[in-house]
């Protein structure tokens, strides 16, 4: 049995009615473009992505968040098997991902105001 997350379960109604779930701002690229970017260059190093876009800060944070979520997925199975180190990496990754989500939300709010 595989786990399939319900992406709309924890989202506010306003976000669901907004249309696009993956792109909180019109200046940000789609998730398929980020998947292509990550598959071409690997996860971003120190939060910097390779590209020619003008708004590198929100893109790099979003790409970094996607990379962290990808890494978190790799830690789940060893955690279930009882690996203490995988459990600690999972905890640190969740904390880091939560802070990046806050930063991405703040960035999109700033972009929406301007």
Curated annotation (Swiss-Prot):
Post-translational modification: Phosphorylated in vitro by IKBKE at Ser-45.
Residue(s) carrying Phosphoserine: 45
Broad class of where this protein is predominantly found: nucleus
Pfam family, one: CDK2AP
Cellular localization per UniProt: Nucleus; Chromosome
Lineage top rank: taxon: Eukaryota
Tissue expr: Oral keratinocytes.
Positions with biased composition (Polar residues): 20-36, 47-57
Disordered as annotated region, ranges: 18-57
Keywords carried by this UniProt record: Cell cycle, Chromosome, Disulfide bond, Nucleus, Phosphoprotein, Transcription, Transcription regulation, Tumor suppressor
Chain positions covered by the region annotation Interaction with CDK2AP2: 19-24
CC terms in the record's Gene Ontology section: chromosome; cytoplasm; nucleus
Family named by the database record: Belongs to the CDK2AP family.
Function statement: Inhibitor of cyclin-dependent kinase CDK2. Also acts as a component of the histone deacetylase NuRD complex which participates in the remodeling of chromatin.
Name of protein: Cyclin-dependent kinase 2-associated protein 1
Name of the coding gene: CDK2AP1
